[in-house]
Amino acid sequence: MSGFNFGGTGAPTGGFTFGTAKTATTTPATGFSFSTSGTGGFNFGAPFQPATSTPSTGLFSLATQTPATQTTGFTFGTATLASGGTGFSLGIGASKLNLSNTAATPAMANPSGFGLGSSNLTNAISSTVTSSQGTAPTGFVFGPSTTSVAPATTSGGFSFTGGSTAQPSGFNIGSAGNSAQPTAPATLPFTPATPAATTAGATQPAAPTPTATITSTGPSLFASIATAPTSSATTGLSLCTPVTTAGAPTAGTQGFSLKAPGAASGTSTTTSTAATATATTTSSSSTTGFALNLKPLAPAGIPSNTAAAVTAPPGPGAAAGAAASSAMTYAQLESLINKWSLELEDQERHFLQQATQVNAWDRTLIENGEKITSLHREVEKVKLDQKRLDQELDFILSQQKELEDLLSPLEELVKEQSGTIYLQHADEEREKTYKLAENIDAQLKRMAQDLKDIIEHLNTSGAPADTSDPLQQICKILNAHMDSLQWIDQNSALLQRKVEEVTKVCEGRRKEQERSFRITFD
């Protein structure tokens, strides 16, 4: 055993110790024990050889041991070991509570850990345990059991007793044993522990250097490294199931485990030197879970005069693998983030374009809405004007009817008196003047219509011409020619005047020259 230890059997091992233990040949007990033998660890004082003690025969006994003579000094728990079970157990002796009338084996096994009623139930629950050292503890145990030579078969289902080597399936509590071949736990084990294979102590000859591979990955609480000679794995829900391997690395377990120390995170190589041998431990197995730092199990029937191997801190192996996987994960995450960023930028660009179009359409709609509103106001005004005009026309029509009503009796009176009234000269002139006024009025109306037509024609002709109309193009060409001809005419008139002036000057000079010639020759 290594580390801070309150109990355990075996030879003095490496660690912090203040005394030299005697060589013990009793069967070791591992687990949660307050009785200390000659083991290494944090001890003050050295116990003597263990004395024999009679196991208790009560149903719930506290394993009263025969105290041995102690040496003087300041010691912590130097109780002697009995040939029976050690540790904190309830009813380790002959069980009074037996499920079948079977005889208990005379040789008591080493109940490991915290055992409740470790009676020998051989035929009660359809399981047979054949062991050279003793019967494996049954019941609710928290520690690994002893090493068994012959494999035993266990029935599947809900079992409280475990065979030595068979693979129990289902809900299993306290099933333990050894197997020649390593198996991996299939479900949630609570304490897969590996017994330590340590180097020989000072009282034994040189032993071969055992090499075991154990690795612990995950959160292990107060866990230490122990080498494993053999391994046995259980399937199902097990509490404190030891895992021992023979020549092969133990498989990793995952889940909540009340495991014994013997698991380290990563791959580590540790060399511890005892009196005659060197143990090199290379961790390769991995266990993940929640560990409560139970002590490793020493094989039953083998003296524990061995030195425990101390494991170095976990190496960078597992961290490197995890870093590689995490780096790949980060790269994939970065690529996904970049892809999503590009897609987001593209979508944002499209969204901005569509938002710009929608904004333009919204402005157009707002402007058109304002125009429609103003047009509606104008239409309302026109409707009001039309209503007033209709009222005025109705008023005029009513006045005209009244006037006609007033004129009709007067016309009748005039017709009655027409035969007696003679037309005078003034009346004839008035009639002519009236007819002339009617003619002038008709002519004015025609002139107004003609002026209206002329104005409309001028408006249509003054409008910008259509450039695509060929007539308009021809008109433009003709206008350009006309302008050119006018310019030529104006310039030709100027040239004509200049030519006439030059001609006059030439004629005058010619006459002067002729006159001078005549004077000279005369």
UniProtKB/Swiss-Prot annotation:
Subcellular compartments: Nucleus, Nuclear pore complex; Cytoplasm, Cytoskeleton, Spindle pole; Nucleus envelope; Cytoplasm, Cytoskeleton, Microtubule organizing center, Centrosome
Low complexity bias (residue ranges): 180-215, 262-288
Residues bearing the modification N-acetylserine: S2
Positions in coiled-coil regions: 328-458
Post-translational events: O-glycosylated. Contains about 10 N-acetylglucosamine side chain sites predicted for the entire protein, among which only one in the C-terminal. The inner channel of the NPC has a different redox environment from the cytoplasm and allows the formation of interchain disulfide bonds between some nucleoporins, the significant increase of these linkages upon oxidative stress reduces the permeability of the NPC.
Positions of region (5 X 2 AA repeats of F-G): 6-143
Domain of life: Eukaryota
Protein's UniProt name: Nuclear pore glycoprotein p62
Major site of localization recorded for this protein: nucleus
GO biological process, one term: negative regulation of cell population proliferation
Record's disease association: Infantile striatonigral degeneration: Neurological disorder characterized by symmetrical degeneration of the caudate nucleus, putamen, and occasionally the globus pallidus, with little involvement of the rest of the brain. The clinical features include developmental regression, choreoathetosis, dystonia, spasticity, dysphagia, failure to thrive, nystagmus, optic atrophy, and intellectual disability.
Assembly behavior: Component of the p62 complex, a complex at least composed of NUP62, NUP54, and NUP58. Interacts with NUP88. Interacts with NUTF2. Interacts with HIKESHI. Interacts with OSBPL8. Interacts with CAPG. Interacts with SAS6 and TUBG1 at the centrosome. Interacts with MCM3AP isoform GANP.
Domain text: Contains FG repeats.
Sequence repeat locations: 6-7, 44-45, 76-77, 114-115, 142-143
Protein family per UniProt: Belongs to the nucleoporin NSP1/NUP62 family.
Keyword Ribosomal protein included in the entry's annotation: no
Function: Essential component of the nuclear pore complex. The N-terminal is probably involved in nucleocytoplasmic transport. The C-terminal is involved in protein-protein interaction probably via coiled-coil formation, promotes its association with centrosomes and may function in anchorage of p62 to the pore complex. Plays a role in mitotic cell cycle progression by regulating centrosome segregation, centriole maturation and spindle orientation. It might be involved in protein recruitment to the centrosome after nuclear breakdown.
UniProt-listed InterPro entries: NSP1/NUP62 (IPR026010), Nucleoporin_NSP1_C (IPR007758)
GO terms for cellular component: centrosome; cytoplasm; Flemming body; mitotic spindle; nuclear envelope; nuclear membrane; nuclear pore; nuclear pore central transport channel
Keywords: Acetylation, Coiled coil, Cytoplasm, Cytoskeleton, Disease variant, Disulfide bond, Glycoprotein, Host-virus interaction, mRNA transport, Nuclear pore complex, Nucleus, Phosphoprotein, Protein transport, Repeat, Translocation, Transport
Region (Disordered): 169-215, 260-288
Glycosylation sites: T373, S468
UniProt-recorded Gene Ontology molecular function terms: chromatin binding; Hsp70 protein binding; Hsp90 protein binding; phospholipid binding; PTB domain binding; SH2 domain binding; signaling receptor complex adaptor activity; structural constituent of nuclear pore
